[in-house]
Each structure stands twice: as C-alpha cells, then as structure tokens.
Amino acid sequence: MGISKASLLSLAAAGIVLAGCQSSRLGNLDNVSPPPPPAPVNAVPAGTVQKGNLDSPTQFPNAPSTDMSAQSGTQVASLPPASAPDLTPGAVAGVWNASLGGQSCKIATPQTKYGQGYRAGPLRCPGELANLASWAVNGKQLVLYDANGGTVASLYSSGQGRFDGQTTGGQAVTLSR
C-alpha cells in the first residue's frame, strides 16, 4: 500500500500550516506598547487688524459690456469652436469608433456619393446613430444625416482623429480612430 502524491502533498501542507502557528514572530503581540502621544502645538499669535482706505474705482479698467441684445437667441453649443480646422471629405473618410450615451459602435464613412453628401454605414449603433445614412462636410462642421435628409448629429474636429458634437436630440456623440 503506497502513499499517493495527493496524500503526501496534503500532509506536507498541513505540516507547514502547523509550523506557522508555532512561530515566535506572532507571540509577543501582547507586549506591544502604543506610540507616545504627539507633542502639543503652540498657538499662533493673534495680530492686529489694520484699517486702510481702498483705491478709487476710477483707476481700474471698465467692466466688460453686458449688452446681450446682439447675442439673444444664439445657442452657444451650436457655434463652431474657434480652433476647429476646416474639413475635407478625405479627412473624414474611413472607419470611426462612435460613442453615444456610453455605448459604442463603428461607423464607416466612404467617399461614395449619396443623399446629402456621402454614404455612411453604421454598424450596430445605438439611438439616433442607428438611422445614419449619409454624411457631409460643411466648412468646419461634420454633419450626419438620416435617409430622409434630416440631420442626425453635428460634430467638430477636436483633435487629430477625433470629432465631438451632439445629436439633434441633445446627446453627446464622439467619433475617434
């Protein structure tokens, strides 16, 4: 009757565990004293408050204009970013990783003429991007359209290989390579 390898391994493991319980490293935990209390902190001396006159307001520049009549009705989010570059169809063509509402998908943007500009192919895209049929470049703006020619989303380049914008429903959408 021989001893199997599993039995021998179990016996060795039990011996190691029991030997660990006999260690003197854990035996003196009852004799450990707490650290000494920290030294007291001295109070900060209180100074006196001095009184002085403020400078005349006429020596400061004028406040910016608050005339809102020229800007009424303008949606700031719809304005193009000042740093956005002008786009070309060649810069947009290709396959993009799209992100909408925390979900992601892929969008193919070949330079095949279709509808408002060029054909677009969404692959398992969520929400409004599922209706995507075409795309077009309009100056600094990339516009995505549905099959009826309605705008699905408007985006601007926010860096090399990245577009950020909103769907017509107001959801943030990002395209990246």
From Swiss-Prot:
Q: Which residues form the signal peptide?
A: 1-20
Q: Where in the cell is it found?
A: Cell outer membrane
Its cellular-component GO annotations read:
cell outer membrane
* Any GO molecular function: endopeptidase inhibitor activity
> Which superkingdom?
Bacteria
**Stored SUPFAM superfamilies:** beta-Barrel protease inhibitors
Listed PROSITE patterns: PROKAR_LIPOPROTEIN
Q: Which UniProt keywords apply?
A: Cell outer membrane, Lipoprotein, Membrane, Palmitate, Signal
Q: Which residues fall in a compositionally biased region of kind Polar residues? A: 50-77
- Similarity section: Belongs to the rhizobiaceae omp19 lipoprotein family.
The protein, known as: Outer membrane lipoprotein omp19
Organism field: Brucella abortus (strain 2308)
Taxonomic lineage per UniProt? Answer: Bacteria, Pseudomonadati, Pseudomonadota, Alphaproteobacteria, Hyphomicrobiales
